[in-house]
Amino acid sequence: MPAERPVLLAFASTWEDRAAAFLDRLQTVLPGADIILVAEFPPPREFAGVRWIPWFPRRTLRQNIARIRDELRGCRLAWAALVLDRLLPYWPMRAAALWISRGRLLLFNEQMNHFALRPGDAPQALRFLRWRLRDWIHRQTHPGGWLYTQLWRVRHPRAYLRPLFASIALAAGFHARFWKSLRRAPPLRLPDGGLPDGVSIVIPSRDGRPLLEKLLPALERELGQIPGEILVVDNGSADGTARWLAQEHPAVIAEISSEPLSFSAAVNRGIARARFRHVLLLNNDMEPEPGFLAPLRAAFEEVPELFCATAQIFFPPGRRREETGKAVWRRKRARPDFFVHCIEPVEGENLSPVLYGSGGCSLFDTARLRALGGLDEELRPAYVEDLDLGFRSWRMGWPTVFVSASRVVHHHRATTSRFFKPEELQTWVEINFLRFLLRGAGDAGLFGELWRTAVDRLNWHAAQEPKRPWAMFALRAACRAYRYLRPLPPARMDERLILAAGSGAIAVFPGRRRDPSKPLVFVLSAYTPWPLSHGGAVRMYNLMRRAAEDFDQVLIAFCAGHAAPAREILDICTEVILVEREGSHLRPMTDRPEVVEEHDEPAFHAALQLALRRHQPDLVQMEFTQMGLYADDCRGVPTVLVEHDITLDLYRQLLAERNGWETRQQWQRWERFERQLWRKVDCVVAMSQRDAAMMEGARRVEVIANGVDLERFSPSAEAPEPRRLLFIGSFAHLPNLLGLEAFLRRAWPRLREAGSVLHIISGANPEHFLDLYKDRVQLSLREPQIEWEAYVSDVRPAYRRAEIVIAPLLASAGTNIKILEAMAMGKAIVGTPAAVNGLEIEPGADALIVPSVEAMADAVLGLFENREARTALERSARRKAEACYGWDAIARRQAALYCSLINRPPRAAAS
C-alpha cells in the first residue's frame, strides 16, 4: 500500500453484526482513505475492499500489537477508530487502539455517533458520558441490575440464601480439592481365581411382575446356548413377585428384600451372588432383541481389560429417543446444560469408547466389578451410579465400549415413575452428580474445575423463574461436601483423557478381518485419505491400498464430523478410528506452531493410547508434520514421520516473499518443533533428495517420492479446448492461494485479453479458506472467463479439456502431486521453479519452467501458438511420469522400509 495514502484503522470492538454499520460509517469519515479492519472475524462480504488484520483474543496484548504494527508497515495512519460497545467491551482491543493511535483515535457509540480524543470534541465526549451514566443508572435501578438486586434482597432476606449457599458450596469444594490432593487409597488389585465362563443376569425389580412376565422368557431363550443364570432382586415388592417366580420360573434365583433398597444396594446384592465371568445388569423395563447377548460377549474378546460393553437403546415407536446407549461427556456445554448426554450413534460404528455403560443394559467383567466395590451405595436412591462406576473403571485403565449390534428397547422409567415425582427424580440426579464428583474424581485440579462449574450451573438454575426447587436442594447438599469424600486408588489413566475418551469425539469403525500373519501398521493422519481431495490424500490412499496386500492397517484420523468411512478405506483397513476436531482461533500463541496446537487434541491422545493397548501394532506411521506431536504416545513402537512438506522450508520461502511478523513467528516455531521431531522418530520419510538434505540430525531418512496412478491418469485422444488453462490446488493450502492470487494479478490480464479461459478447481470448502486467509489473500474469481469449481471427485475430464496446466507457486515444500497427474495425462505444464520443487523434471523438456509469475503470460501465449512445442512437452512429461513416478515401485520402497523397521524380511511380510 503506498505510504502517501492515508488509512483508517478500525478496531471492531463490537458484535459481528454491528461491524457492517461501523464500516459503513467509517467510509463517510475520511472519503478516499483505505480502511483496515482489526477484528476476530473477516469483514462482511459486501466490504471486499477492506483489508483485514485478525485479532486473536487468546494471544497477549503485546503479540496482537506486534502483529498489527507489522501489517501497517508502509501505511500512514490517519485515524484509528473503535466502538465503545457496553455489552462487548473488548478491553485488550481498546488498549491496542489507544496504544497504536497515539491519540488519533475516534470513539463510536452503539448508534455510530463519534468523537475524537481532542479538546475540540470535549462537548461530544461529555454528552456521551452523560448518556452512558444515565443508561448505567437506569440499568442498575431496574430488574437485572446489581443495585436493584441488592435492594430487592434487603426487602426479601430469604433471597440471600441462594448466593450464600453457592458461596458455601464453593468453599466446600475448595476444602474437598485440598483433601483430594493429600489422600490416596492403596492400589486396586483384582481378586485371584477365575470365574467360569458364562453370564449372570441381574435384574432389580420393585412391583415389576408384569414387566418380568414379558422379559424372563426372552432371557431364558437367550441363555439356552450359553452357561448362565438369572438373578432377580425383588426390591420390596408388594405384588407377589417372589411367589410368582418360585411357581413360574423356578430356575430364576430370587434375592428378596422386604424393604425397598436404593438401586445401587439392590444391584449389589445380585452382583454378590453372581457365579459367572460376566454380569449383565438389566432393568426390568428393557425389551432385548433376540441375540443381543452375543455382540456384548464378543466385545470382551476384542478389547483387552474391558470393563463394560453397553447395548444400543431404542424407545418404543412414537416416543422421543431420550437414550441411545452412547452416553458421553458433553464437549460443548451451555451454562444450563447437564454434563453428560446421549448422542446418536453413527451408522457402522462399533466398540467406540463411551464414558459409562447404562446400568440398565450393560455387560460387565464380574471380577473387575467386584474389585471396584460394585455400585456406590452413597448414590441413593437412584441415578448417576452408572456414571460413577464407569469413571472409576476408566481410572483403572478398564474401558467401556458401545456395542451397536446389541439392541434393546427401553420402556423408560416404567418403575421409578410409579413411585416418584419428576421433581424428585431431577433432585436425585443433581445431588448424586455432586456426590460423584466428590467420590469418583481423584485429580484435585480437575475436580476443582468441575465443582466450580457444577455449582455455577446450579446457582443459575436456582435464580430462574419459575422456581426450580431441585436446584436449591442440590446447592444446599453441595455445602455438605465433606460428608461424601473418600480416598481413591492411584489412577492408571489421566482423568482429563478419560473425559476426552468418553466425550463422543471418537468413533470406531470395523473394516476387513485382521490377518494375524501380517504385521500391523497404525496410520495417524490429520485427514482421512478419502475422498482424494488434495495431494496428501492421493498419496496416502495409493500407498495404503498397495500396502494392504502385505500389511494390516489401522487408520486413526481427524475429521470435521463423524460419518461412516468410505468403502474404499474400510476395504484396506482392519479398523478406522475417526476423531472429531473443532478448529478454533481462540488459542494462545505458545512455543509450538499454531497448526500443531490446533491438532493437539486430548481425544486423539486417548484414541491412540486405547488403540495401542488393544492392537499392539508393529509400526506407527504419522502422516503430516503436525501429527508428529503424538510420537511420545508411541514409545516402544517403531515410528515413521512422513514429511509431505518440510514446513520450516515452506515458511522460509514465505519469509523471503514477505518478511511479516506472523510468518516469522511461525517459522521460528517450526524450526524448533520440526528439527526436534526429526531426532525423536525412528525414521523420517522425505518426498525428494532435496528435502532429505535438509533433515540434519534425523536418526534415519528415506526418500519415498510422490507418485501417480499411471493407468488412471493417461493421455486422451480427444483434442483439448483451445486456450483453456487449468489450475488445481486446494485452497486449504496457503501457498496455492498465494500463487493463484499472484497469477491473477500479474499474468492473467494479458491472457484474458488473448481470449483464454481459466478453470480453477479449489478443493472442498473453498469459501471457508478464503475467509480464513483473507488477511493474506484477496481473490476475485467472479468473472466470465474464469470457471471455478470446489471439490471434484474425478479431475480427469478437467485435464482432458485443458490445453495447458498452470502451476504459479511462489513457495512450495515437498513435491506437487498435481504436477505428476498432469504429466501422466500428457499435458503441457507452465510453472514456476517452486511448483516443481524436488521433482526430477528437466525444464524446457518435461515442463516449461519460467523464473517468475509475470513470465508465465509469455510462456503460455507462446505454447498456444506453437503446437509442436506443446506436443513435445506433453510426450516428454508422460515418459518421465512412466519412468520415475509409478505408485507400484514407490509402494515397494515403502514396504521395504516397514520390514526393516520391524525386523521382518519382505518375503515374510508378504506371506
Feature locations, PLM:
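Short aromatic/hydrophobic "clamp" motif used to bind/position activated sugar donors
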Residues: V279
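Conserved catalytic-core segment of nucleotide-activated headgroup transferases in glycan assembly
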Residues: R18-L30, R539-M540, V703-R796, R800-R801
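N-proximal low-complexity "stem/linker" segments adjacent to membrane-targeting elements
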Residues: L161-R221, F509-S517
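Glycine-rich, basic loop-to-helix element that forms the pyrophosphate-binding segment
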Residues: S257-A274, N284
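Acidic/His-rich active-site region of diverse nucleotide-sugar glycosyltransferases
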Residues: K180-L182, G198, A266, A272, ...
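Non-catalytic, C-terminal membrane-associated alpha-helical segments of glycosyltransferases
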Residues: H156, Y160-S181, G445-R512
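A conserved acidic beta->alpha catalytic loop
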Residues: A218, D234-R243, P766
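Active-site-adjacent helix/loop segment of glycosyltransferases
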Residues: R395-R486
